[in-house]
């Protein structure tokens, strides 16, 4: 089979797939050329490329398989009409959620200790400053309590923090929750603003579903405890850009660490980055362990496709019947 990755430069990803699928051709295309590539591919791996209705006009395409979780850029309705399955890889257990959770905690520490200023002080020979804020005895609010949110909570267990989880439907609803992971409180979406009022650190881990676009907007930021930090390792659209910029400029938000943005690549000259923002280039899941684990899961689903077996983690399972 021919498998096309809709991005260039992901050598580790390509190598992982080729090692797992030695009989298959692994190709690359520019994101804008996804429809053209689909005409000559059995499987597309979109990464961050928009997969529009035009892609599903292909007579050869048999599967759109994401190398990770995010499906927000894929026209799943068009895929369903064309009878083409769309699948992803759950974050937990693949190395993805685990890697993302580690970066989220690193970003909290960078914000609390004002790492950019600390580095600047070093080169200016100013030692003993700035005075930072510890994670210990802080309140961390995790907005979105799926696989990634749970892995963040799991890793915070030894830090002496109070953890409040917020999910759309609250405890006992939605995706399976690991009972071995401790949180001090778990509330549904109605409790979001009350939770934000307690937060020293807000970690956004919610998917960019239609219901979540702009979830952290002016009202949510107005509800936040003054001087709180915010981390986004989910998707840019979950936070309202204008509201975040206003919150940073007013000082209500003490700082933000962003691994995801509203457009990617993001403009390094954007006014937002002149505020107290630590940006990273969407690397939360970019680790050797994640590439290897997700690659194995992707390859396993492609082998199921080849064998005519039931695909796993299909977003439109009705096409499989």
Question: Where are the regions that the model predicts?
Answer:
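Glycine-rich NAD(P)-binding loop of Rossmann-like domains
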Residues: 118-151, 181, 185
């Amino acid at each position: 089979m021919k498998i096309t990755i809709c991005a260039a430069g992901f050598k580790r990803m390509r190598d992982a797939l080729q090692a797992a699928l030695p009989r298959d051709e692994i190709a690359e295309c520019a994101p804008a050329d996804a429809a053209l590539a689909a005409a000559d591919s059995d499987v597309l791996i979109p990464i961050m490329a928009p997969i529009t209705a035009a892609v599903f006009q292909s007579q050869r395409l048999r599967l759109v398989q994401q190398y990770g979780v995010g499906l927000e850029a894929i026209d799943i309705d068009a895929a369903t009409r064309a009878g083409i399955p769309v699948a992803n890889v759950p974050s937990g257990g693949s190395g993805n959620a685990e890697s993302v959770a580690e970066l989220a905690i690193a970003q909290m520490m960078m914000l609390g200790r004002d790492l950019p200023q600390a580095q600047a002080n070093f080169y200016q020979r100013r030692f003993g400053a700035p005075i930072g804020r510890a994670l210990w005895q802080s309140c961390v609010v995790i907005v979105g309590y799926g696989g990634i949110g749970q892995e963040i909570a799991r890793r915070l267990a030894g830090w002496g923090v109070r953890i409040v989880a917020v999910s759309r439907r609250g405890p006992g609803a939605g995706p399976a929750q690991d009972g071995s992971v401790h949180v001090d409180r778990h509330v549904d979406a109605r409790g979001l603003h009350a939770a934000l009022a307690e937060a020293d650190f807000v970690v956004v881990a919610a998917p960019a579903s239609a219901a979540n676009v702009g979830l952290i907007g002016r009202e949510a930021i107005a509800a936040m405890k003054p001087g709180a930090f915010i981390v986004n390792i989910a998707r840019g659209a979950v936070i309202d850009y204008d509201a975040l910029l206003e919150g940073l400029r007013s000082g209500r938000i003490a700082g933000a660490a962003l691994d995801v943005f509203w457009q990617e690549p993001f403009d390094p000259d954007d006014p937002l980055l002149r505020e107290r923002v630590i940006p990273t280039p969407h690397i939360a899941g970019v680790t050797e362990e994640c590439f290897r684990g997700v690659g194995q899961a992707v390859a396993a689903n492609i082998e199921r496709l080849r064998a005519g077996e039931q695909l796993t983690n299909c977003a439109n399972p009705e096409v499989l019947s």
